[in-house]
Amino acid sequence: MWQERLAQLVTTCHWIGAKGWAPATGGNMSVRQDDTWCWLSESGRDKGSLTTEDFLQVEIATNQAPSGRKPSAETGLHTLVYRLFPEANVVLHVHTVNATVLSRIEKSDTLALQGYEMQKTLSGQHSHLDTVPIAIFDNDQDIDALAARIADYAQTRPLRYGFLLRGHGLTCWGKDIQEARRQLEGLEFLFECELMRRRYEP
């Protein structure tokens, strides 16, 4: 099953690369193998031309890659999602312009999305009248410290669909490739709408 997800993820990475959502080898993507292992894109690889050989097996509990090759810098964020959400089988981390800029414009620790029909692309959302909170965390080169802050947040506040890293990008997930891809595309559309609203509304 995970082998099929990995093959689908490679196709999704090519789609992400074509959209310019992971420029200059940025971003990283993974699939869960089981409760112990995941497969994560290798550091420094162009996402538009990845193959299955560009993914490393990583232990979820330790962030270690038995092969000795270097997984992506944000490995600890992927494994955190898999530990926090047993239902998550795919994690996508992208560096889109909309996510990067909006995360800097919004000064609070939460981006509130409300009033958009496309909120319904997110699993469990049924109305544009609902408010969808997307957590924002200050960026940190110490990924272990960043992951610890996110884990602490998740103990007391809902963390659904994804989160933003200020001035960095978006991390989102899903139970399968289709859900993760839909939620990435939906959030990216909503971020663009919110940026335009803030630009044009008095």
Curated annotation (Swiss-Prot):
Alphabetical list of InterPro entries matching this protein: Aldolase_class_II_sugar_metab, Aldolase_II/adducin_N, Aldolase_II/adducin_N_sf, MethylthioRu-1-P_deHdtase_MtnB
SMART domains the UniProt entry points to: Aldolase_II
Keywords: Amino-acid biosynthesis, Lyase, Metal-binding, Methionine biosynthesis, Zinc
Gene Ontology MF term list: aldehyde-lyase activity; methylthioribulose 1-phosphate dehydratase activity; zinc ion binding
Catalytic activity, as annotated: 5-(methylsulfanyl)-D-ribulose 1-phosphate = 5-methylsulfanyl-2,3-dioxopentyl phosphate + H2O
Disulphide bridges, residue numbers: none
Cofactor: Zn(2+)
Entry binding sites for Zn(2+): 93, 95
Top EC group: lyase
Record's cofactor remark: Binds 1 zinc ion per subunit.
GO biological process: L-methionine salvage from methylthioadenosine; pentose catabolic process
The protein's Enzyme Commission number: 4.2.1.109
Pathway: Amino-acid biosynthesis; L-methionine biosynthesis via salvage pathway; L-methionine from S-methyl-5-thio-alpha-D-ribose 1-phosphate: step 2/6
This protein's record includes keyword Metal-binding: yes
TM regions (residue ranges): none
A GO cellular-component term linked to this record: cytosol
NCBIfam families for this protein: PRK09220.1, salvage_mtnB
Family per similarity comment: Belongs to the aldolase class II family. MtnB subfamily.
Function: Catalyzes the dehydration of methylthioribulose-1-phosphate (MTRu-1-P) into 2,3-diketo-5-methylthiopentyl-1-phosphate (DK-MTP-1-P).
PANTHER family membership: 3-OXO-TETRONATE 4-PHOSPHATE DECARBOXYLASE-RELATED, FUCULOSE PHOSPHATE ALDOLASE
UniProt protein name: Methylthioribulose-1-phosphate dehydratase
Source organism of this protein record: Klebsiella pneumoniae subsp. pneumoniae (strain ATCC 700721 / MGH 78578)
Gene behind the chain: mtnB
